[in-house]
Amino acid sequence: MMNDTITPEPHLVPGYTGHCTENRDRVGKTYGKQTHKLLIDPCIYHAPELIVLPIHAKQGLKDYPTEHELKVLRRREDLVDAVYRHPILPGYAGFVPNMASQTGKRYVAAASAGVAQHETLMELYRCENRTLRHRDLLESGKGLFERKLNERLLPQARYRSPLIPVTGRSKGVKDEECPPRVDKLRYSKFTSPHFLEDDDDDKFIINGYAAHIPMAVTRFGESNQVLTHRALCSFSDYMYKRKRDAWCCGQDLTRPAVTCPPVGHFVIYHDDIGMVPSYAGHVPGELYKFGRTYGKTTINAKRWLDIHRGLTGLPEVSNLDYTY
């Protein structure tokens, strides 16, 4: 009867909030007896070390921080002005190197391991820096001591530092004068980016431009400035190289290609044809016209501006003729 009331060891005390392997899949027994069977079952995959240690456990059984990490931290305090000193207590809100890569450890152990890894990397950098300074000293010829075996294996150049300035026959050669640099014209609202030079920084279309951008349909995955710049470069190359005869008809083709086509190619509102229905830009007077298609309404849209150039009142009360 006494054996039935006493839970055998080992077992977990009821109220333990930690993890117990396969405990949620077993039912029908008390927490103590159930965890006892789970802890001694050889068929269950347990962690390599128990989280709950016996009371009589020795203090030397802790694995973290390791002896190597403590040695690195002590040596660091002797060599440099150490900001991080062991132990770093929990609650420290500052930055600790390599802290994010330490998992499954207490705060003191994780902080010690992170600082030890950082110090090991910095020691490697300091060693490489000393090797480079030592090699420069050997190549400069200022070292008066005999070179050792490891110094002979260092890669050496055929010259000595610092380099000595040489003045020879080239002193009498006249320097070539470069042509004066022509300053680029400043960008303005009347400048079209379509036919600017490919290396021009202003050859792109700003965000919010609602009209057609040539050769930009097949491009994606780039920012607006990069995408429109490459699209305009492809467009200008195509127009200059593939259709040079069509652009430059009536001109002397023996001369270099023109830098910009005629201004008539950039007309938006034509006198004899209307805008395409998908045009999302502004059309003068389109708001006050109705009863016809979009293409018929937008023919010669600038005439609306000429009619209302001297108008002082609203178009609704001016009783003007909109039959054009």
Swiss-Prot record:
Its main location: cytoplasm. Keywords: Cell projection, Cytoplasm, Cytoskeleton. One of its GO terms (cellular component) is microtubule cytoskeleton. It is found in: Cytoplasm, Cytoskeleton, Cilium axoneme. It holds the Pfam family CMI2B-like. InterPro entries: CMI2A-C-like_dom. It comes from the Eukaryota. PANTHER family: CAT EYE SYNDROME CRITICAL REGION PROTEIN 6, PROTEIN FAM166B. Belongs to the CIMIP2 family. Probable microtubule inner protein (MIP) part of the dynein-decorated doublet microtubules (DMTs) in cilium axoneme. This is CIMIP2 protein GA14893. The lineage of its organism: Eukaryota, Metazoa, Ecdysozoa, Arthropoda, Hexapoda.
